[in-house]
Amino acid sequence: MLVPTMYAVAHGGGRRFISEYYNQMTLDAKGKPVAKRLLNISTIPHRSNTLSSVLKYMTPTVYGETLFETNILSPFHQKNRRYYKYAVTQLPFGKAQIYVYPRLKNTQVIEARAIVDSKTGKISMVDFEGEYDMTRFYISIIMGRDGFGSLSPAKCSMRANFSFLGNKITGMYTTVYGLPKILSDSLNNVADTTLMAKVRPIELNQEETDIYNRFYEKRKQVADSLNNNIPKTNFAKDILWDVIGDNV
């Protein structure tokens, strides 16, 4: 699973960051997804996460009783039908479009639009929109095509908006599932741009590339400046701390 993220912080002139994660996904005894982070590169200081609480929204259980762990009632589970209103429009090629609206205003329900097979009801695409824990989110999902994979997302994209104390934060996330195994499972939260380039399923756009270039150029300038003015022992302590701190 790869999760590239970009953050736009309105306060302070529009600061932008980008992070990418490459995770190994497994299921625990209860069938809950468990992620082991193999790679992690980021322009956020100390490789911290922004809006980390919304990352769980990237592994929705569309057909489950709740979409995200214990939060948000799925409109596609039979037990939750009483909480939603549905409108169906027939489409060509044996497809139908379903519009879903909450019967009552509540943070545990959402609006949704899905493309389904008219005969089987299998969902091929679905969009969700809602608000939970002070975060407004918009999620677009492409489901897997065949067999057991059709019950889970193949690709999930999300935009999340959060406002707090005058700061407006926007996070844009894309997760791709079912990537071929290329790297060793022994990796643990490694910051390696070369390895990330090998597994990245979606090429970086120009804006994302520019963010990385500015970050590494600035870090090089700081490192060069410190090398010229302070002992190397202090350089290792002060400059590399943000890289290794997460692994201590």
Where are these regions (language model features)?
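Structured extracytoplasmic
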Residues: 1-97, 103-109, 173-248
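Gly/Pro-enriched, hydrophobic low-complexity segments
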Residues: 85-88, 93-192
